[in-house]
């Protein structure tokens, strides 16, 4: 098996998300191509060491001028390549690190969100309502199964998200009607699949081995199920997958333009706006951390910079003489 295929397979065995597997494979390929350019020949990772990784990371920081987050992503991927795929611990690294910028997220106010949602429809609108109304990542929205939404308790169970953690978040009352309609749409797709003998969806790795029959259950169908069937890329069976997050991202950009919003608006902007709005309305930083699923509260504290500072409540002197 080729080394890049080994990266993909190792990610699958460890039950990493498809996005993580794709990212790790991409960085492994970029690294090996860079080594080839430097040495003039292909070199197997077993013949490389920490100095090669340090040189590549330094190249990213000094020549390509990547962001600190990008360099850290590359580092994680290469540590995975050596430790988990090749089986070599390359020890501590001493590369030049990219400078981390002081990033303040772009957020929308309530009027802007209302305008944005007004130009969205169907699954695009519902996905955005869950990102803004429950603080979900776009990947978490599209990973939801029918069973993860409890309409009675008004909760959403986010399973095995970033960092392989589960968490419970609120289900916005305003989204319940749309959730019911979407679940009914999925039920119709499920009934069609049962009739054609192809009611099957992909299950999480460990659970798939323990309970393979669950792949044919309506409870495990994606809430944002694709309208078209597709074949599993590895095993070849015909079934359903969820809609692609890129579709809603394109819709958001178009909706923002039509609404006359001149800020940069992405799926993550809605999550940022959720966090900021909760804080401005009296939520604690700890509550926001738990709702967002952050491991480190320092990650959450960046939203404190987005809230309206108390100093802005001071009346401008110009107002007194106007």
PLM region descriptions:
Residues 1-322:
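Conserved catalytic core of the tyrosine transesterase superfamily
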